[in-house]
Structure formats: C-alpha cells, structure tokens
Amino acid sequence: MDKKLVIAVDDSRHSKNAVRYAAGIHEVLKDMKFTLMHVQPTISEYLLEEAKKSPQAYAELEKVNRKNSETAHCLLEKYKEQMMALGIAETDIQLKTQPRMLGMAKDILEFSMAGHFDAVILGRRGLSGLQDVFLGSVSANVVNHTSNTPVWLVDEKETSKDIMVAVDGSENSLKAVDHLALMTAKNTDIKISFFHVTPKLKDFCPVDFEETQTEALEEQGID
C-alpha cells in the first residue's frame, strides 16, 4: 500500500533540505507518494475589506492573488523538477498551493488531515530557544499543534538513511514505533536502531538529595 507524505515548502534552503531528504529516503522506503505544498503569503486585511466596497480595490486584490498563485506554482514546479532529477517518478509527485487561512502551521495540518497523509515533512530552521520565542517557527508550530499527524523535521546536511527511534515506554513513544512500522513495512534495506536513556533518581524524585547520596542510592540499584 502506498504511503502518502506532504512536504511543506517555501523558498528557503531549509525546504530544499526537506525535499532532498524525502527524495533520498525514497531509495529505501518504497511505495511513497509525495505532495509538495506551499501556503501563500497573508493578504492585507485592509485590502480584503476594501475589496468588498471598491471595484478598484477588488481588482488589486485579484492581481495580488494571481501573483501569489503564479509564484507558488513556479516554486512547486522547481521542487518537482529537483525531485524528478533525484529519481522520483513524476506520477509520484503532486502539487498543492492555497492562500493562508488559519495560519501557516494550521493550514499545513488541516490539509494533511483532510488528505489522510501518513506524515508531514518540513525543513527545520534550527532556531535557538530564545529565537523561537521571538521569531516563531513554522516547524515548531506544526509540532506543537499536531495531534495525530506524524511530523518529520529535517535538519541541514542530513544524509543518513538509517533511522534511530528514541523510546521511553510512553504512549507517544509507542505511537512513534507504530508509525515507523507502518512506514518501513516490508523494507529490508533500512537499518533501525532503538535508543533508550535510563533515567536517574534525580530525574523524577522530588527530594533534593546531595550528589553523594544520589550516587550511593544508584549504586544500590535504586535508579
């Protein structure tokens, strides 16, 4: 059964990284269909309101809409050509663009859920925590708002096709393993590693032990 993935893109190197990674992982994860999606820029609220009253403003709004749509289609065609150059069949690539309605992250998630996609792929900007607070991040917002749609975040210079799954026995961890099983079913050419970090006593105990006391308890097997 084909797996459906949506790659949310803009005109940035981070999106280029996501497209390149998706094409590369296709070598080992077979039967994948891709949809390249671009959410168009926000249109001025003033222009939207004026367009309801003024024919001139309405004409200007139509002009802006056409420009945004043309720019989006050119961008998507460029990424489509890149994926085809990396070995993806043209029939396995669909294009989708739409005006921004709910917000960039929510529009991406709404589209992915409505289309029953198996995952969303995005390039990650790699902002620090402080930068993320002030500037925001589409990838961070997608992760924060998703409930059922798996999200793949791609960093720069991501070349490995092997997969590592960090597990801790939680429900979300089991969901990640379930998603991995779905995506890798019947593929024997991929290496999967499961990684678990054993917690220390201080990670979950509210008592403020001295470091020597903690070490002594851990040596006795209380960790």
Explain the meaning of each model-derived region:
Residues 1, 41-44, 70, 77-120:
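Structural beta-alpha unit
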Residues 1-61, 88, 161-222:
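Small/aliphatic-rich secondary-structure junction motif
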